Design a protein with these regions (language model features):
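Sec/Tat signal peptide C-region and signal peptidase I cleavage site
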Residues: 18-22
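Bacterial N-terminal signal peptides
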Residues: 7-16
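Ligand-binding "clamshell"
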Residues: 87-94, 116-120, 232-244, 306-308
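Periplasmic-binding protein-like
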Residues: 188-197, 236-260, 305-307
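Early extracytoplasmic/lumenal segment of secretory-pathway proteins
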Residues: 23-85
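Mature extracytoplasmic/periplasmic domains
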Residues: 250, 254, 259-317
Length: 318
């Protein structure tokens, strides 16, 4: 009987101890193809924290998931306008910068951006532009204007984004409006232009991540694309070129945030700070080709041609 009691007590004690022995983790919700896989491995090896990595394809998909239950995620990667919305809905935790020493490398102009004026809720991850990636062998002349995406000579030859913000923004810019306008007449006019484009059969497909591979394969004359994906595609196909049209475009920023009530807040801070290390930020830049907001990483780039590439590092004029 004593032996049975001892076994029972031992089992009970082990059961009580199991939660404390459980492996630490961090739940990350990021875009498709938006991190160097080796970076995750390095973080896990250094910290012993397991990264549960989940992916989304649009800001809107991510927003719905976070609104439904923010506690499911510890680190998310929303774009600027979604960060602003998440702040307004009280769905983000304030960041403890005492645990983010590598945030010091953030470029000055991104430390207190309009969408997060005090920089309390987000650390920039990547930034870039929206433009047109086109195949020089499949267009009649170099592309300079957004109107090219409505040109009927390119029927069934244009990829548009499956992104309300960017697709509507392009139509607004083509019509001479701000991408951020809230004027309903302007928004309805832009909506009508997009309907007109679709009815004319110009759009081959509405998609996001697939466009870069299909442009590499020469499957369309042009596609609406973010600058990083364009740079990646051009590295595989010399016939491709990227342009920010003369009417102007959107400079966007994707940030790293911690949702309200995150279960692993401390681990989330460790993950964000790890990504802000200059050498780690450089690894991500080299892998995904988006513009890094990390001054330390930029200093590590020793190729002047890379620094001069306006697809990778847009100038003030762009």
């Amino acid at each position: 009987m004593k032996k049975l009691l001892a076994v029972f007590l031992t089992a009970s004690l082990l059961a009580c101890a199991l939660p404390a022995l459980a492996a630490e983790e961090v739940n990350v919700f990021n875009w498709e193809d938006y991190i160097c896989d080796e970076v995750i491995d390095l973080f896990e090896e250094e910290t012993g924290i397991k990264v549960n990595y989940m992916r989304f394809t649009t800001n809107e998909d991510m927003l719905v998931q976070v609104q439904a239950d923010p506690k499911n995620y510890d680190v998310i990667f929303p774009s600027d306008y979604i960060i602003e919305r998440l702040i307004s809905e009280d769905l983000l935790e304030e960041l403890d910068y005492s645990q983010l020493p590598n945030a010091q490398y953030t470029l000055d102009w991104l430390k207190t951006p309009d969408y997060d004026p005090e920089g309390k809720y987000s650390v920039p991850y990547m930034w870039g532009t929206v433009g047109i990636l086109y195949n020089k062998t499949l267009v009649s002349a170099p592309i300079t204007s957004w109107t090219a995406m409505w040109d009927e000579q390119y029927v069934d030859n244009v990829f548009m984004m499956d992104s309300i913000r960017d697709t509507l923004g392009v139509a607004l810019k083509m019509l001479g409006y701000s991408m951020n306008t809230r004027d309903m007449d302007a928004l309805n006019e832009a909506k009508d232009k997009l309907i007109e484009q679709k009815k004319a059969g110009i759009v081959k497909a509405y998609q996001v991540d697939e466009t870069k591979d299909k442009m590499i394969a020469g499957e369309a004359a042009m596609g609406l694309m973010w600058s990083g994906d364009a740079a990646y595609a051009m590295s595989f196909n010399d016939d491709l070129a990227y342009v920010v049209p003369e009417e102007g475009s959107n400079v966007w920023v994707d940030g790293m945030c911690i949702p309200k009530g995150a279960k692993n807040y401390e681990n989330a801070l460790k993950f964000i700070d790890f990504l802000c290390r200059p050498e780690i930020a450089l690894m991500n830049f080299e892998e995904i080709c988006y513009c890094t907001p990390n001054s330390g990483a930029i200093e590590l780039i020793d190729d002047p041609e890379v620094l001069a590439d306006e697809t990778l590092f847009p100038s003030d004029e762009t």
